[in-house]
Design a protein with these regions (language model features):
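Selected transmembrane alpha-helices and immediately adjacent juxtamembrane segments
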Residues: 111, 219, 225-229
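The feature marks the first
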Residues: 22-25
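Cofactor-cradling patches in redox/metallo enzymes
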Residues: 116-122, 126-200, 229-327
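Conserved AdoMet/S-adenosylmethionine-binding subsite of the radical SAM
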Residues: 211-221, 233-240
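Iron-sulfur-cluster electron-transfer modules
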Residues: 4, 8-11, 27-193, 202-207, ...
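Cysteine-cluster motifs in flexible loop/terminal segments that predominantly coordinate metals
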Residues: 14-20, 48-54, 256
Length: 327
């Protein structure tokens, strides 16, 4: 189905209840209005952070899909040249001396770095491969690049994006795909690929984590928007590593949306005062927290487990160091 026809159909199913506005992260800070977008005003999508909360309250249509299309159109976005050159939506990181994952050729599964990790945090690939190895899962690197979730791809219809995913994933040959980004897992599953975020296998191996040397930190958890309903599972994982978890409201990191993200992050930071670090399950959240001036130090989930294993090799790449690292 043509993308414009698809979006028009989704808009026509909106009943105008306004619940999407009530839960919208951006709207609270003077940003987008999803109801106006659903009623045809694409310009009202300005300020959308892509949190997807609109989808969680709507039983009639798919407002997030419409919002992403609207953001794509009002910003005249096309698939970037860097994607055609590298397979990724963002330029590859220039960090040096990053520890190398110990991939196994023709392994039982593959690990997908995703665009954010490839661009700004390649050390998370090392941390995640090492944790999977700890759990008895050997991996080979997924070389298919981007999952086509990002907004620049939202001018394409589902058929076109699925075709890209199926073509770029041929190297899987039916094997399991683990992702570092939760959005990648959802996108790849939508194309019929056996994919899951790495936390899914971690949560099934808590006894392995409890047997590690451990790490004594007081932390908050921000799972990221896609995994917001899984905070209890994250808590069990973090506690199994030896940490104390301070409960805090789950929320979007705000990404890098001008005029919105600064306000969103200020609230996130204020809600977590006093912790040693915030543990996240999303690379986009990781990048946002790590870049926030004078903010709370951040650990990606597999980095925390890596620390519990006694390996701190990813810490030197952080902008904000975790000041209290004791085992």
């Amino acid at each position: 189905m043509d993308i414009r026809e698809d979006i028009s159909g989704l808009m026509s199913k909106c009943i105008g209840c306004g619940q999407c506005v009530d839960v919208c992260t951006s709207r609270k800070y003077g940003g987008c209005n999803p109801l106006e977008v659903m009623q045809g005003n694409l310009e009202a999508a300005r300020g959308c952070v892509g949190c997807g909360l609109c989808n969680t309250v709507c039983n009639f249509t798919v407002p997030k899909k419409v919002m992403m299309y609207a953001v794509n159109r009002i910003n005249n976005m096309d698939v970037p040249d860097v994607y055609h050159e590298t397979g990724y939506n963002l330029p590859t990181s220039t960090l040096t001396d990053v520890p190398e994952p110990r991939y196994v050729k023709d392994a039982m599964s593959q690990l997908m770095p995703g665009c954010i990790v490839n661009a700004s945090a390649p050390f998370l690939e090392y941390a995640t491969e090492r944790v999977l190895d700890l759990l008895g899962v050997s991996t080979e690197r997924y070389e298919g690049g981007c999952c086509t979730y990002p907004v620049p791809f939202r001018g394409l219809d589902d058929r076109q994006r699925d075709a890209i995913k199926k073509e770029t994933s041929k190297g899987l040959n039916g094997r399991k795909l683990y992702t570092i980004c939760p959005g990648c897992a959802v996108e790849m599953r939508d194309a019929g690929i056996d994919a899951e975020h790495v936390y899914q296998i971690i949560r099934k191996n808590l006894d392995v984590l409890r047997g590690l040397p451990g790490i004594n930190l007081t932390v908050a958890i921000q799972t990221g928007c896609t995994l917001r309903s899984d905070v209890r599972c994250f808590t069990k994982i973090v506690e199994a590593c030896g940490c104390k978890v301070v409960e805090t409201e789950q929320g979007c990191c705000g990404k890098l949306i001008p005029g919105i993200s600064e306000k969103v992050m200020a609230d996130r930071q204020a809600s977590m005062k006093g912790v040693d670090a915030v543990v996240v399950g999303c690379p986009s959240c990781f990048a946002r927290y790590d870049q926030y001036p004078e903010g709370i130090p951040v650990l990606y989930l597999t980095e925390l487990i890596l620390l519990a294993m006694g390996d701190d090799r990813t810490m030197r790449f952080h902008r904000r160091a975790v000041s209290r690292l004791s085992s």
